A protein has these predicted regions:
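Short beta-strand-to-loop capping motifs
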Residues: 1-3
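Short alpha-helical segments enriched in small residues
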Residues: 6-186
Length: 186
């Protein structure tokens, strides 16, 4: 560019183009966290959320409740690490776990629907997976996570495979769950 003004104009054009291309992936341009954005959307819609977490071990609930005022939209949740608690607290049928395994799309859906119903929430999230470093198999490797989001119009489920260590997998699993809510409410 021949001048600072031309360079600035060109930079603004590129920023606009990037924003257009990445709009589905950018949730904030002012530094707000994903949990803040999700809380904002839930409040705008007068909606509530409950979670049933397995491999994330409460990280999702911790992230949501780290935001002041989250009690207006977050009803609570359960860390259902054992199969018995999946059945007892989130109403996952034991037969479903026996048939498909605890780490499955079917169990993620049952977790989301069960916790939504139990807490009488607008939305329920179910997360189950293999955070590692052990416990993986060729069919269900470390990093495999199923996320389900249940609402009054049905339930959607997403399968993801995350790399990295246990904490990284747990973080990305919680990020994916929050992003599912964000996209649903946009």
């Amino acid at each position: 560019a021949a001048s600072l003004e031309q360079a600035s104009a060109r930079l603004n054009e590129l920023v606009d183009k990037l924003e257009e291309e990445l709009q589905d992936f950018v949730f904030s341009d002012n530094g707000d966290s994903l949990e803040q954005i999700v809380g904002y959307y839930l409040q705008m819609r007068n909606a509530t959320l409950a979670v049933a977490e397995s491999c994330t071990g409460g990280l999702l609930a911790e992230r949501i409740t780290s935001i002041g005022g989250s009690s207006r939209y977050f009803l609570g949740g359960a860390v259902v690490y054992s199969n018995e608690l999946k059945t007892e607290f989130a109403d996952v049928p034991a037969e479903l776990i026996e048939m498909h395994g605890a780490v499955s799309k079917q169990v993620a859906v049952a977790l989301a629907e069960g916790i939504r119903k139990r807490c009488r929430a607008s939305f329920g999230i179910g997360i189950t997976g293999v955070a590692g470093p052990t416990g993986g198999t060729p069919e269900k490797p470390v990093g495999l996570v199923f996320h389900a989001l249940a609402g009054e119009r049905g339930t959607e489920v997403v399968e993801k495979r995350f790399g990295g260590d246990r904490n990284r997998i747990r973080w990305f699993a919680s990020q994916q769950a929050l992003d599912m809510v964000r996209r649903k409410l946009m």
